[in-house]
């Protein structure tokens, strides 16, 4: 796969806030599983969810100078099959993520 450009930290932060939102986001366990599946090191699982995700994404980008595995994580997090029983949550997350991804 071709290297995708790094994302600005402001975009990463807001994506992390969407994905790890207390009410509508992934659980800590889900975040850990998806980080492992995307081959991104979980740098500090004791932090709040969005900070944990932000630090993992930032470390990945700083080391690899691309956003490939972050995009893999997001693709896995938003797979429609994960939302068969809750299509409204899928629509919400997709809408919120796209608001930030349009800046990339």
Kindly give the residue locations of the regions a language model identified:
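Charged interaction/catalytic cores of defense and host-pathogen modules
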Residues: 1-104
């Amino acid at each position: 796969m071709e290297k995708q450009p790094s994302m600005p930290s402001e975009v990463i932060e807001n994506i992390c806030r969407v994905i790890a939102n207390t009410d509508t986001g992934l659980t800590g366990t889900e975040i850990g599983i998806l980080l492992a599946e995307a081959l991104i090191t979980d740098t500090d699982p004791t932090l709040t969810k969005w900070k944990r995700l932000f630090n993992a994404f930032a470390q990945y980008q700083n080391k690899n100078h691309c956003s490939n595995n972050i995009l893999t994580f997001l693709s896995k997090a938003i797979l429609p099959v994960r939302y068969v029983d809750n299509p409204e949550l899928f629509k919400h997350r997709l809408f919120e993520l796209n608001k930030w991804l349009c800046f990339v």
